[in-house]
Swiss-Prot record:
Function: Involved in targeting and insertion of nascent membrane proteins into the cytoplasmic membrane. Binds to the hydrophobic signal sequence of the ribosome-nascent chain (RNC) as it emerges from the ribosomes. The SRP-RNC complex is then targeted to the cytoplasmic membrane where it interacts with the SRP receptor FtsY.
Catalysis performed (reactions): GTP + H2O = GDP + phosphate + H(+)
Binding-site positions, GTP: 107-114, 189-193, 247-250
Lineage start: Archaea, Methanobacteriati, Methanobacteriota, Thermococci, Thermococcales
Oligomer and partners: Part of the signal recognition particle protein translocation system, which is composed of SRP and FtsY. Archaeal SRP consists of a 7S RNA molecule of 300 nucleotides and two protein subunits: SRP54 and SRP19.
Signal peptide per UniProt: none
InterPro entries: AAA+_ATPase, P-loop_NTPase, Signal_recog_part_SRP54_M_sf, Signal_recog_particl_SRP54_hlx, Signal_recog_particle_SRP54_M, SRP/SRP_N, SRP54, SRP54_GTPase_dom
Stored PANTHER family: SIGNAL RECOGNITION PARTICLE 54K PROTEIN SRP54, SIGNAL RECOGNITION PARTICLE SUBUNIT SRP54
GO MF: 7S RNA binding; ATP hydrolysis activity; GTP binding; GTPase activity
Keywords: Cytoplasm, GTP-binding, Hydrolase, Nucleotide-binding, Ribonucleoprotein, RNA-binding, Signal recognition particle
Primary enzyme class: hydrolase
Protein name per its UniProtKB record: Signal recognition particle 54 kDa protein
Length: 448
C-alpha cells in the first residue's frame, strides 16, 4: 500500500493504545506523541501536524464514548475521523459528463505524468469508456513511444507525431481526430519540460485555449513531500476546473507530506498512484485510505476489485462463494491465484482485510508472492484428476509431480499443506465475519 512506513507507525500507536491497561491523560498524550512522530517522519508540515494532534488530544480527553463503545475504541474512531478530515473528508470522483470529455494533464518534469496518463486511460477503459490519448509532448519524443508501449496491448489509440515541434498544434489536431472517431474521453498528455510552476501554468493556458478541456489534471510527484503545497496552490489559483493526481506513493517516505500539503490547499485529489503496474491507479477516497492506513481494512475496495475481475470473466461469483466456504479443489485454487495476481500485489490485498494490514512482515509477504508463482508451476505438472481430487495425491504421485515441475517433494507437500490451510482460513473468513470486523468501529468509510 501507499505510505507503508507511516501506516505501520500509526498502527503501532493504536496497538499500544489497545494493549494499555488504563486510558488516562498520560496514555492519551503518549499516543498523540507517537502519532506526531509518525507524521513528521512522513514529511508532513509541522504546523499541520500540531493542529491535527491538538484536535485529536482535545477530543480524546473531553469526549465520552457512546453506550456500548469502549474508551479505546472511541479514541481510535477519533484518530480515524481527524485523519480523514485532514486529508479532505470526502472523495471527489472524476466526472465524465460530456461526449467527448476532454482532459488535459500537466506536470513538472519527472512527476510521472506520462505513466499516469496511461493509467488513467486504462482506468476509464475498464469502466466502459472508449478512450483516446493525445501525446503533445514535443520536448521528449520518447513520450509518444512510451504511451504506445503502455496502451497498445489494451487497444487504446495514441495520437502523436514525434517529428512535430508545435505542442499546441498537436493537441488541437489530436482532439479533432478523436472527436471524429466518436470516443467518450480524450486525454491530452502535455510536455513535462518545466522545472517550476510558472512555465507549467503558461503552457497549460496555451493548450487550454486551443482545446477547451473540461478537466485539467495536475500530476504531482509524491516523493517531493510538503513541497507539493506550492505546486498545488499555484495550480489551484490558475484554473477553476483543476484536480490532482499524486504519484509514486508506493516508494516514498514523504508521501504523507505530499498528500497533506495538497489537501491543505483545498485542491481536489482525485487519484493516487500506488505502484508501477498500469492498474496501480486508484480514486482517492480519504475515508477508505485512512482506514487502510490504520490497519482497519477496506472491504468496499476489496469487493470492487473482485467486481472488476467478474466483469472481465476472471472471477465468477460462484467461484468466490466456493472460495469463502472452503469448498474448492486445486483447480479452483489455481484459477483464483491467477485472478488474485491480477488484483494487485498480495500486500495490497491483505491491507484491505481488517486486522491483516500490517500483521505480516514485508519479507514474509514477498516470499509468499514468490511461493505462489512456484505453486502454479507445480500445479502445471499435475493431471486433471489430481487437480480436481487432491486427496488422491499419494507419495508416488508427489515424486512424479516434483520431477515434472523441477521442485522437491518437500515443496509439493508444502503446496498441499497450504491448500488445506487455505480451505480452513477462507472458510472462517467469510463475508459476514469481515463485515462484523469492519462494523466494530462503525466507520461509514468502510462501505459496509
Amino acid at each position: 500500500m501507499a505510505l507503508e512506513k507511516l501506516g505501520q507507525a500509526l498502527n503501532s500507536a493504536l496497538k499500544k493504545l489497545a494493549r494499555s491497561s488504563t486510558v488516562d491523560e498520560a496514555t492519551i498524550k503518549e499516543i498523540v506523541r507517537d502519532i506526531q512522530r509518525a507524521l513528521l517522519q512522513a514529511d508532513v508540515n509541522v504546523k499541520l501536524v500540531l493542529q491535527l494532534t491538538k484536535q485529536i488530544q482535545k477530543r480524546a480527553l473531553e469526549e465520552e464514548p457512546p453506550a456500548g463503545v469502549s474508551k479505546k475504541e472511541h479514541i481510535i474512531k477519533i484518530v480515524y475521523e481527524e485523519l480523514t478530515k485532514f486529508l479532505g473528508t470526502e472523495a471527489k470522483p472524476l466526472e465524465i459528463k460530456h461526449k467527448p470529455t476532454v482532459i488535459l494533464t500537466v506536470g513538472i518534469q519527472g512527476s510521472g505524468k506520462t505513466t499516469s496518463v496511461a493509467k488513467l486511460a486504462r482506468y476509464l477503459q475498464k469502466r466502459g469508456y472508449k478512450v483516446g490519448v493525445v501525446c503533445s509532448d514535443t520536448w521528449r519524443p520518447g513520450a509518444y513511444y512510451q504511451l504506445r508501449q503502455l496502451l497498445d496491448p489494451f487497444g487504446i489509440e495514441v495520437f502523436g507525431d514525434p517529428e512535430e515541434k508545435d505542442a499546441v498544434k498537436l493537441a488541437r489536431e489530436g482532439v479533432e481526430h478523436f472527436r471524429e472517431k466518436g470516443v467518450d474521453v480524450i486525454i491530452v498528455d502535455s510536455a513535462g519540460r518545466h522545472k517550476e510552476e510558472k512555465g507549467l501554468i503558461e503552457e497549460m493556458r496555451q493548450i487550454s485555449e486551443a482545446i477547451k478541456p473540461h478537466e485539467v489534471i495536475l500530476v504531482i510527484d509524491g516523493t517531493i513531500g510538503q513541497q507539493a503545497y506550492n505546486q498545488a496552490m499555484a495550480f489551484k489559483e490558475a484554473t477553476p476546473i483543476g484536480s490532482i493526481i499524486v504519484t509514486k506513493l508506493d516508494g516514498s517516505a514523504k508521501g504523507g507530506g505530499a498528500l497533506s500539503a495538497v489537501a491543505a490547499t483545498g485542491a481536489p485529489i482525485k487519484f493516487i498512484g500506488t505502484g508501477e503496474r498500469i492498474d496501480d491507479l486508484e480514486p482517492f477516497d480519504p475515508k477508505r485510505f485512512v482506514s487502510r492506513l490504520l490497519g482497519l481494512g477496506d472491504i468496499q475496495g476489496l469487493l470492487e476489485k473482485i467486481e472488476e475481475l467478474q466483469k472481465e470473466q476472471e472471477f465468477r461469483e460462484e467461484d468466490m462463494e466456493k472460495f469463502l466456504r472452503g469448498k474448492f479443489n486445486l483447480k479452483d485454487m489455481y484459477a483464483q491465484l491467477e485472478a488474485m495476481q491480477k488484483m494487485g500485489p498480495l500486500k495490497q490485498i491483505l491491507q484491505m482485510i481488517p486486522g491483516l494490514g500490517y500483521s505480516l512482515p514485508e519479507d514474509a509477504v514477498r516470499v509468499g508472492e514468490e511461493k505462489l508463482k512456484r505453486y502454479k508451476v507445480i500445479m502445471d505438472s499435475m493431471t486433471e484428476e489430481e487437480l480436481e481430487n487432491p486427496e488422491i495425491i499419494n507419495y508416488s504421485r508427489i515424486k512424479r509431480i516434483a520431477r515434472g515441475s523441477g521442485a522437491t517433494t518437500a515443496e509439493v507437500r508444502e503446496l498441499l499443506n497450504q491448500y488445506n490451510q487455505m480451505k480452513k482460513m477462507f472458510k472462517s473468513l467469510n463475508k459476514r465475519k469481515l463485515a462484523k470486523m469492519a462494523k466494530k468501529f462503525n466507520f461509514g468509510g468502510l462501505g459496509i
